[in-house]
Swiss-Prot record:
The keyword Cell inner membrane does not apply. HAMAP family: RuvC (MF_00034). The RuvA-RuvB-RuvC complex processes Holliday junction (HJ) DNA during genetic recombination and DNA repair. Endonuclease that resolves HJ intermediates. Cleaves cruciform DNA by making single-stranded nicks across the HJ at symmetrical positions within the homologous arms, yielding a 5'-phosphate and a 3'-hydroxyl group; requires a central core of homology in the junction. The consensus cleavage sequence is 5'-(A/T)TT(C/G)-3'. Cleavage occurs on the 3'-side of the TT dinucleotide at the point of strand exchange. It is found in: Cytoplasm. The active site is at residues 11, 71, 143. GO terms for biological process: DNA recombination; DNA repair. It comes from the Bacteria. This is Crossover junction endodeoxyribonuclease RuvC. Keywords: Cytoplasm, DNA damage, DNA recombination, DNA repair, DNA-binding, Endonuclease, Hydrolase, Magnesium, Metal-binding, Nuclease. Homodimer which binds Holliday junction (HJ) DNA. The HJ becomes 2-fold symmetrical on binding to RuvC with unstacked arms; it has a different conformation from HJ DNA in complex with RuvA. In the full resolvosome a probable DNA-RuvA(4)-RuvB(12)-RuvC(2) complex forms which resolves the HJ. Mg(2+) 1 binds at residues 11, 143. The gene is ruvC. It comes from Bartonella tribocorum (strain CIP 105476 / IBS 506). Mg(2+) 2 binds at residue 71. Coiled coil: none annotated.
Length: 171
């Protein structure tokens, strides 16, 4: 029987941070849970980051993933918005790392290519393929669906990552 690897995908955002947890056993994928951590827009930035940290910490503590996949930040024209997203992303990287969970990062185009077969696609296509690959998946937001897509992407690439790591260790 294949070892089960639990993967959490995290789609960082300052207002909404999506998360999705799947189990991978051999080639079998199983939906575990998904949701969204929200921060209060009325609060200052530091308080909002604390809210995201607390929420993600609870999720990681509850589901105890073995590996994490986090989306790379895209740079947009609004430097302030990009910086704030980067701060939320730092929390998304920090929380699993604090739980001794290796963190892997994926560009949005790589996630789309892995899940729907092309690097550019509508959110609806991604959500549809998440449901095809994880028929029991339930998600409360686009962010949670995107987080499940991140976890799926990592499940497809982790064998290659593992082989690359083992090859480096053999040198």
């Amino acid at each position: 029987m294949a070892e089960t690897i639990r993967i959490i995908g995290i789609d960082p955002g300052l207002r909404y941070t999506g998360w999705g947890v799947i189990d991978l056993a051999g080639n079998r994928l199983q939906f575990v849970a998904a949701g969204t951590v929200s921060s209060d827009v009325q609060c200052d930035l530091a308080s909002r980051l604390c809210q995201i940290h607390k929420g993600l910490s609870e999720v990681v503590h509850q589901f105890m993933p073995h590996e994490a996949a986090v989306e790379h930040v895209f740079v947009n024209k609004d430097a302030t918005a990009t910086l704030k997203l980067g701060q939320a992303r730092a929390i998304a990287l920090l929380v699993p790392a604090q739980a001794n969970c290796p963190v892997f990062e994926y560009a949005p185009n790589k996630v789309k290519k892995s899940v729907i077969g092309v690097g550019h696609g509508a959110k609806e296509q991604i959500h549809m393929m998440v449901k095809v690959l994880l028929p029991r998946a339930e998600f409360d937001s686009n962010d949670a669906a995107d987080a499940l897509a991140l976890a799926l992407c990592h499940s497809m690439h982790r064998k290659r990552i593992d082989q690359s790591y083992q090859a480096r260790m053999a040198i």
